[in-house]
A protein has these predicted regions:
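Acceptor/aglycone-binding surface of glycosyltransferases and processive sugar-polymer synthases
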Residues: 63, 67, 89-154
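Catalytic donor-sugar/metal-binding loop of nucleotide-sugar-dependent glycosyltransferases
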Residues: 163, 173-190
Length: 274
């Protein structure tokens, strides 16, 4: 059995789309929830009017996922972002079928997003840091490691989850370090609102470095140097638009700088093209 948990904050305008997909994907014994992350626009009331169980959660993506995990009584949980306008394939159904077909511990949904071809956090933070600090993890995620569409064994989500946008990083890395197997599934073409999430880049970078430090991949005394390495990358992400070719090149160059000492052997490596 699976719990389908649609997670969102102030998504009343689009919430029904994700819930419809979840109900279409669910079977006997499954549950469909809306995890309401401190919404103020009536999202929870809308979900209830559709017969959906609402799980209240504090503000923050990780806090919302933690609330879902805490309440979950099934072996697997399927997380869905609530701001779906459309997908060419039913996202939760595709994830469920991939889980059944592969027997993986986690399946992450990948998709084409024509309206958002520029994803700097993936290429400028996740890629260079994980490639060096957690090379065994990097190999499991080809296109969209930070996807909010995923299905996994609830036991995979061990330890306190990051409160915000680092939750996908946590699931990806700790799952791999625990010997869990991750597969990906193509959910087609996605359409949804493009929003600025100013805290996301810093939270993703911090989550990667926090795990690296806690598990001995990064020396505690070297952490400040790695935080300093991130600073120009974070600044450029905040300043760079999809059509700004000059700053995009500057961002690529910043992400390709040699990483500081204090990480695994070989960390002091130029990662051109990150």
């Amino acid at each position: 059995m699976i719990t389908f948990a649609v997670v969102g904050h102030n998504e009343a305008a689009l919430l029904n789309n994700a819930l419809e997909q979840a109900y279409a994907a669910s079977g006997p014994g499954d549950s469909v929830w809306f995890v309401d992350s401190a919404s103020t626009d009536g999202s929870g009331e809308l979900a209830r009017s559709l017969g959906t169980k609402v799980v209240r959660a504090p503000l923050g993506k990780g806090r919302a996922v933690a609330a879902a995990i805490e309440h979950c009584q099934t072996e697997h949980i399927c997380l869905l972002d609530a701001d779906i306008e459309s997908t060419t394939r039913n996202a939760p159904e595709t994830l469920r079928r991939a889980l059944e077909r592969t027997g993986a511990d986690m399946v992450v949904g990948e998709f084409d997003w024509p309206d958002k071809p520029f994803r700097p956090v993936t290429h400028s933070i996740w890629a260079p840091l994980v490639r060096v600090l957690f090379p065994e993890v990097a190999a499991s995620f080809r296109r969209m490691p930070l996807s909010g569409f995923r299905i996994f064994d609830v036991a995979l989500a061990r330890g306190p989850l990051p409160p915000g946008y680092g939750v996908e990083v946590h699931l990806n890395i700790l799952g791999s370090l625990d010997g869990r197997r991750t597969e990906t599934a193509d959910i087609g073409t996605y359409s949804g609102p493009i929003r600025g999430n100013p805290g996301l880049p810093e939270e993703v970078g911090a989550a990667i470095l926090d795990i690296a430090e806690s598990c001995g991949r990064l020396d505690a005394g070297a952490r400040a140097s790695w935080d300093e390495w991130l600073e120009p990358v974070l600044a450029l992400i905040g300043e760079t638009g999809a059509d700004d070719k000059l700053r995009r090149r500057m961002l690529t160059e910043a992400a390709a700088r040699p990483l500081p000492e204090g990480g695994p052997a070989g960390a002091l490596t130029n990662l051109g093209g990150a």
